Structure formats: structure tokens, C-alpha cells
């Protein structure tokens, strides 16, 4: 079990946290970006359990290359939970930026144009958060946070992060426990930033392996100790350690000179 606790205890801790943060902010509730993936689905389920369906707004923000199945799954989550949801297509915004793949003169750039999508979605989330006095509930998990798998000032930006202390493999267990639809749990995780993209292909590592390394990293183990304990190739372990170090800037505020 997670941290040696039962699933019920984990759910109770997270839902208590959500309620407390909403009350502290004197907010009317939360807004969640629904991608149709497991992380946003679990976040939405937990927010509804914490606050009730009337205090949770879902935002579905597809563009022309979004997998229709993902939109279908996002709507399924919103409708299963009975929450209000808004579909805001971002294709025209991408065209206005002259993003690659959306105007004839530019080819798609995975980094620049992929990150642009995440930042546009962040702006829309905060627009509705401001409009209705809501907190933005982020959907990043602990695995993503450690290795920097997210867009700075994009999907990383949020007011609260309900599943931010759960590794990806733990999110999957929790999803089964709280009743997230099976088809969402079992499909390959994807940030949905370009057609056919999957997390594990982009990260070049399976989440099971990644989480095994990260849990031992948290305990202060060296790459050599992790290799000896798990038999995971040292090259893979060093790769994960490098990702953690390289992406530290995504976990901290911008550096400021001392004066």
C-alpha cells in the first residue's frame, strides 16, 4: 500500500487537503483540465469527493490533432461525476501564434509547439479560475515532477496539486480503487501534445522502472546501490538521476541575485 496506508486513508488525506486549501483561499471550488487521461481523471474524482460535484468545473481543451478518444474519455469522466464541463478548442489560438502544423509555412516543432499547447491550456484554466473564483487543481504526479515531465508555466502551473505526492504507478492503483473507467486506466499514458505521443516513449523508460528508481532515490540511495538492489542497468539509473538534476529549475522559483 502507499506509504503503508490503506487506499481509504490516502483518499481521506487528499480530500481533506483539497477542502482545506479551498476554504483557506475562500474560493468557490476548483477547475480541472480534463485530458481524458488517468491523472486528470483521478484528480477530478478526488475533487468531487472532497467538494461535491457543484464545486468542480471541468475544462476540455482539444485541438485539431487531439485523439477523439481522449475527448470522449474526458467527457465520460465529467458526465460520470455529474460536473459542469466546458469544451474550449484551442486550434484557432495555435493558428494565431503561427504554430507549426497549424499554418502552411511552418513545420511542427515538438518542443516549442508542444509546450505552447500546454501554456495556452494553462491560460484558459486560469481565466475560468479568475472568472468563477476557483483554484486550479493541477494534475501532475510525483514521477513527472521529479523528472521534469511537464511544461514550465504550462501544465505544471496550478494552485494545488492533489496527486503530487503519488508516483504514477500509485496513481494507477488509486484510479482502480476510486472507480475511474477501465479504458482510461489501461490506455498508454500520453500528454497529448502531438499525434501518437506517449509518455513512456518520450521519457524512454517504463513507469514501473522509473518509479522503482525514484522511490529508492528518495531514500538517499546512490545509483550503484539502486543497481545492486534492483538489477536495473546502471545506465538507466544514471539517466533518471540526470533528469532529476537537469529539471530542478521546474521545481523551484526562478533564481534571483542577492543584493
Curated annotation (Swiss-Prot):
NCBIfam families linked to this entry: nadE (TIGR00552), PRK13980.1 (NF010587)
EC number of this enzyme: 6.3.1.5
Amino-acid positions noted as binding Mg(2+) in the UniProt annotation, renumbered to this chain: 39, 144
This protein's name: NH(3)-dependent NAD(+) synthetase
Catalytic activity: deamido-NAD(+) + NH4(+) + ATP = AMP + diphosphate + NAD(+) + H(+)
SUPFAM superfamilies xrefs: Adenine nucleotide alpha hydrolases-like
Listed pathway(s): Cofactor biosynthesis; NAD(+) biosynthesis; NAD(+) from deamido-NAD(+) (ammonia route): step 1/1
Enzyme class: ligase
Keyword NAD found: yes
Subunit record text: Homodimer.
Molecular function terms, GO-annotated: ATP binding; glutaminase activity; metal ion binding; NAD+ synthase (glutamine-hydrolyzing) activity; NAD+ synthase activity
InterPro entries in the record: NAD/GMP_synthase, NAD_synthase, NH(3)-dep_NAD(+)_synth, Rossmann-like_a/b/a_fold
Chain residues that bind ATP: 33-40, 139, 168, 190
Source organism phylogeny: Archaea, Methanobacteriati, Methanobacteriota, Methanomada group, Methanococci
Task performed by this protein: Catalyzes the ATP-dependent amidation of deamido-NAD to form NAD. Uses ammonia as a nitrogen source.
One of the record's GO cellular component terms: cytoplasm
Family that this chain belongs to: Belongs to the NAD synthetase family.
Keywords assigned by UniProt, alphabetized: ATP-binding, Ligase, Magnesium, Metal-binding, NAD, Nucleotide-binding
Recorded coiled-coil stretches: none
One of the GO BP terms on file: NAD biosynthetic process
Domain of life: Archaea
Gene3D superfamilies linked to this entry: HUPs
